[in-house]
Amino acid sequence: MPFIVNTASERDEMLKAIGVSSFDDLLVAIPEEIRLKRALDLFPASDEPQVRKLLEGLASANKSTADYVSFLGGGAYDHFIPAAIKTITSRSEFYTAYTPYQAEVSQGTLQAIYEYQSLVCRLYEMDVANASMYDGATALAEAVLMAMNVTGRSKVVVAGKLHPYNSSVLKTYLEAAGHHAVIQNTLEEGVGSIDALKELVGASVAAVVVQQPNFYGSLEDVEAIGAIAHENGALFVVSADPLSLGMLAAPGSYGADIAVGEGQPLGTPQSFGGPYLGIFTVKQQLVRKIPGRLVGMTKDRDGEDGFILTLQTREQHIRREKATSNICSNQALNALQAAIYLSLLGKEGLQQVATQSAQKAHYLAGKIAAIPGFSLKYKAPFFREFVVETPIPAAAVIERMLEHKLFAGHDLAVHGETGLLVAVTEKRTKAELDSFVDKLEGITGI
C-alpha cells in the first residue's frame, strides 16, 4: 500500500491537538527502565522499485493453479471463474463483506443478498436461505446447534465420511456449547453403513449429518439416511457441494430439514483456503430458528418494492440471551460472487460444469486404475473426486509430480489414512488428463 510519512510540522500539529508537546509525553505510563533507548536495528531503507522487486521475487516462489495443473480438492476446487465476476464484485458499492448497520439505506446490497438467497433456495430445493455464513464448516456446526435447539436433544450422528476439518470445527462448536456426543457411523467401502446407522440413531439424537459427496468424493445413500433420521424424530442435516447439484439430486428433494454447503466452487478462488462462503438453507417450519441474517422483500409506504433485514429478533444484537446464534455478520461479497456465477451459467451451464467434471474424473480414474501398482481405494460411485492407492507413499507421488508442474492431489496421510485424493474439474483437458497418467507411470518405476 502506498504510504507517505508525516512531516515534522504535521506531527507537531497532531501532538498539539491532543495537548502534549512531544512524542515522549505519550510514553509517560511506560517506566523508563523498560523503554528502548537505542534505534531499531533495521536494514537500510529502500525505494519503491527496490521494494517491489524484492516482494515480487519472494512471491514468485509461490506456485498457483495459474502455473501448475491442479488435481487438488478436499474442499477447495479449481473451477473456471468467469472474468465478469471480478469485474462486478470489484465495483466500490459492492466491495465490502458487511451488511450495513442501517441496512435499509443500502437497497442495492440488500437486493444482491436477496437474489443470492433466492438462487440458493432453487439450487438446494429448500424454502429459506440466510444471507450466508463464514464457510461450509461453520455452516455445518451452526446447523447441528440449531437441530439441538429445535429438538431439545444432545447427540449428533455423522452418517458417512465428513471432511476432517469440518468434523473438527463441529466438535469445537459443540464442546464450547457443553455437548460432547458426536457419534461416527461405521464406514464400508468409503461410505456410511446403513445397517450400522440404524443401531446408532435413537431417541436422544438431535441430528443425523451427512456430507454429499463425502470427503472421499463418494456418494452416500442419502435417501436411506434421511429415512432413518426421520423415523427417530431427528433432523436430517445435509452438507451438499453446491456445484454437484447441477447433476445430483438436491437436498430438499430427499427430505433434508437443514441443508448447508461450502460455496467456494461457485465463483470464489481457492485463495489459500479463504475467505469462503457458508451456504445455509432450511425448510419453512424452521425459519425462526435459522442463524445469521435474512433479507426479505416488502412494500414501502408508497407501494414500491423494497428490501429489509427481517425476523431480526432471532439475532444476538436484539436478544443476546435468546439468540439463535452469535453470528451477526455474513460473507456478502462471496455470496455476491456465487449469485453472479449462478446467474451467468444458468441451469444448463451449471449442469454442463457438473457433468464435465464428473465425466473427466471417471475417465482419469479408469486410466489410473489401469496403471500397475495403482488402484481405486473404494468401489462406491463418486462425483468429481476419488481416492487412489499408490505403490509408493502419496507424499512421494506429490513431490515427484511437482517436477512436472502438477499438483497431484491431497495426501490422506495428513488425516492418518492411506491414499491420494484426486479431484478433477471441468477445466482439465484430455491432454492434461493423459499427461497426468503418463507422468504417474514414469515416476513410480514399475
Swiss-Prot record:
Q: Which domain of life is it from?
A: Bacteria
- Give its E.C. classification number: 1.4.4.2
Enzyme type, top EC level = oxidoreductase
Biological process, per Gene Ontology: glycine decarboxylation via glycine cleavage system; nucleoside metabolic process
Q: Keywords, A to Z?
A: Oxidoreductase
Q: Which reaction does it catalyse?
A: N(6)-[(R)-lipoyl]-L-lysyl-[glycine-cleavage complex H protein] + glycine + H(+) = N(6)-[(R)-S(8)-aminomethyldihydrolipoyl]-L-lysyl-[glycine-cleavage complex H protein] + CO2
Listed transmembrane segments: none
Any single GO molecular-function term of the entry would be: glycine dehydrogenase (decarboxylating) activity
Instruction: Cite the record's note on assembly.
Output: The glycine cleavage system is composed of four proteins: P, T, L and H. In this organism, the P 'protein' is a heterodimer of two subunits.
Q: What does this protein do?
A: The glycine cleavage system catalyzes the degradation of glycine. The P protein binds the alpha-amino group of glycine through its pyridoxal phosphate cofactor; CO(2) is released and the remaining methylamine moiety is then transferred to the lipoamide cofactor of the H protein.
Instruction: Give the protein family.
Output: Belongs to the GcvP family. N-terminal subunit subfamily.
**What NCBIfam families does UniProt report for this protein, alphabetically?**
PRK00451.1 (NF001696)
State the protein's name: Probable glycine dehydrogenase (decarboxylating) subunit 1
Q: Give the species this sequence originates from.
A: Pelodictyon phaeoclathratiforme (strain DSM 5477 / BU-1)
